């Protein structure tokens, strides 16, 4: 019988530290609901003491989820722990995650503390946290660069103070397979407790070994894996949870351990994070990449046609990738469209379906057939427009002279107020973005601009992702349309709208 490996998802906390990623309040809540549907055991929803926005989103997630444990991060500071308590007290299973750095380089250059000071802080703050929480998780930050004897002392101190989950972070992705496994073996053999202690692994991918090291931790005695969807995170990212889960599933003969994830929700979860983070999943990404189940070589194609297992160790259906798609067309009616939404896993009320059906018919008039990816794109675009404080109403472009273009942009806010401005630029995109900047009265820097086609062919819808720097803060925007310029404008307006929402601003103020 396989042992259970808990999955601790930190997409909303560590994943959001990815440069350029800044989830909105609504996006955080939608992500948390999908993670619960996927079946993760614990969601690290944020760092409540870091900002009012983080506190409110953690609180909302705690009040919304029904089965998943909701965790908040806290430094060894009582005010941090209090903030986590207030944010998560309504959760079905509240958890606090207390951490302090333990490596020599952190003690000397960051904390300016001695080892004795660190041990005293661990004892004081884990003891305090245990008074408020049934479950306290402790992490010695930069554990893999901490001398092993001192690491054992830190963990023993935390356990004696009441911690029942011990997380060992490879904070800078420094460790390797055997070394990381040895740390867990040493801790499980050396640390004593009358309570059951769950050891957890948290790996970064700086040397490309986050998933490998996570699996090594299981071999060393870990029973929980921390990571993010698609492996997003600061620098090179975190362990990709979907890769860990499928490795355990496919190689159960070796690991003898399984997660409780609903694997059929894997692709949908990956797509959601990709969309909200504005980070396209690489085509060759394991498990969820577009090429994961593609075969170009003639020999490989021949083998797969004869027997799929000749070159595939898992089926697309296992992770929720459909291979029996029945596209819709311009003659498809509301009933067929509604059935398609259910088949794709969407639970959308009838009123919302009316607007989605109108968008579907508009696309069907332009395309021979509407694929599942088109349907997903329609819903994605609708979600973004529904959340936005401002949305694009009309866009007019005109060629002026000498390569200059003129753009007139009209946007509308949720109260129905109309805002309009115009500008010129060396090309359509520059003109459009200058006009939008004039409407919002903000100077911006365009950090990233990417166009992706939703499907193949010249009639494909275009997805545009932008990343802007506004007043020192990065925000991303997403737009989708058959017209690339319309999609580009929608994405730019959404990025501005996100900044305005988070800074409680109105256009023209």
From Swiss-Prot:
Entries under HAMAP family matching the protein: LeuA_type1
Membrane in keyword set: no
Keyword Ribonucleoprotein: no
EC code(s) of this entry: 2.3.3.13
Protein name: 2-isopropylmalate synthase
UniProt cofactor(s): Mn(2+)
Catalysis: reaction(s): 3-methyl-2-oxobutanoate + acetyl-CoA + H2O = (2S)-2-isopropylmalate + CoA + H(+)
Organism: Staphylococcus aureus (strain MRSA252)
Quaternary structure and partners: Homodimer.
GO molecular-function terms, A-Z: 2-isopropylmalate synthase activity; acetyl-CoA C-acetyltransferase activity; manganese ion binding
Pathway annotation: Amino-acid biosynthesis; L-leucine biosynthesis; L-leucine from 3-methyl-2-oxobutanoate: step 1/4
């Amino acid at each position: 019988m396989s042992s259970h490996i808990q999955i601790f998802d930190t997409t909303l906390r560590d994943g959001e530290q990815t440069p350029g990623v800044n989830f909105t309040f609504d996006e955080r809540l939608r992500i948390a609901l999908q993670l619960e549907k996927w079946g993760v055991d614990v969601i690290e929803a944020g760092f409540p003491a870091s900002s009012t926005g983080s506190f409110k989103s953690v609180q909302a997630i705690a009040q919304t989820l029904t089965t998943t444990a909701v965790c908040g991060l806290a430094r060894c500071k009582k005010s941090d722990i209090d903030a986590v308590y207030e944010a998560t007290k309504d959760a079905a299973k509240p958890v606090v995650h207390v951490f302090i750095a333990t490596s020599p380089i952190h003690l000397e250059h960051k904390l300016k503390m001695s080892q004795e000071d660190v041990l005293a802080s661990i004892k004081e703050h884990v003891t305090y946290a245990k008074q408020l929480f049934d479950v306290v998780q402790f992490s010695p930050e930069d554990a893999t660069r901490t001398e092993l004897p001192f690491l054992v002392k830190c963990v023993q101190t935390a356990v004696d103070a009441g911690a029942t989950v011990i997380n060992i972070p490879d904070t800078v992705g420094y460790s390797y397979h055997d070394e990381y496994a040895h740390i867990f073996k040493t801790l499980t053999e050396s640390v004593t407790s009358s309570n059951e202690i769950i050891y957890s692994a948290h790996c970064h991918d700086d040397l490309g070994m986050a998933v490998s090291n996570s699996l090594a931790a299981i071999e060393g005695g870990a029973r929980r894996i921390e990571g993010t969807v698609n492996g997003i995170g600061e620098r090179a990212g975190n362990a990709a949870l979907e890769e860990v889960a499928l490795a355990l599933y496919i190689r159960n003969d070796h690991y003898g351990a399984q997660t409780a994830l609903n694997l059929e929700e894997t692709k949908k979860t990956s797509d959601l994070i990709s969309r909200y983070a504005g980070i396209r999943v690489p085509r060759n990404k394991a498990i969820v990449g577009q090429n994961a189940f593609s075969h170009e070589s003639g020999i490989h194609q021949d083998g797969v046609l004869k027997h799929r297992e000749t070159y595939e160790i898992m089926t697309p259906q296992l992770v929720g990738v459909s291979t029996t798609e029945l596209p819709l067309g311009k003659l498809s009616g509301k009933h067929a469209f509604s059935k398609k939404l259910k088949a794709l896993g969407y639970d959308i009320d009838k009123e919302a379906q009316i607007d989605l059906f109108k968008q579907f018919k508009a696309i069907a008039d332009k395309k021979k057939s509407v694929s599942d990816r088109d349907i997903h794109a329609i819903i994605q675009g609708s979600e973004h427009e529904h959340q936005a404080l401002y949305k694009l109403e009309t866009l007019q472009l005109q060629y002026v002279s000498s390569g200059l273009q003129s753009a007139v942009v009209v946007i509308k806010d949720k109260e129905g107020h109309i805002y309009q401005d115009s500008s010129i630029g060396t090309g359509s995109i520059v003109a459009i973005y200058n006009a939008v900047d004039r409407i919002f009265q903000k100077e911006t820097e365009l950090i990233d601009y990417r166009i992706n086609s939703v499907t193949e062919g010249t009639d494909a819808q275009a997805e545009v992702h932008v990343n802007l720097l506004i007043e020192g803060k990065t925000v991303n925007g997403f737009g989708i349309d058959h017209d690339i310029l319309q999609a580009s404008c929608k994405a730019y307006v959404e990025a501005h709208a996100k900044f305005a929402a988070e800074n409680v601003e109105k256009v023209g103020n």
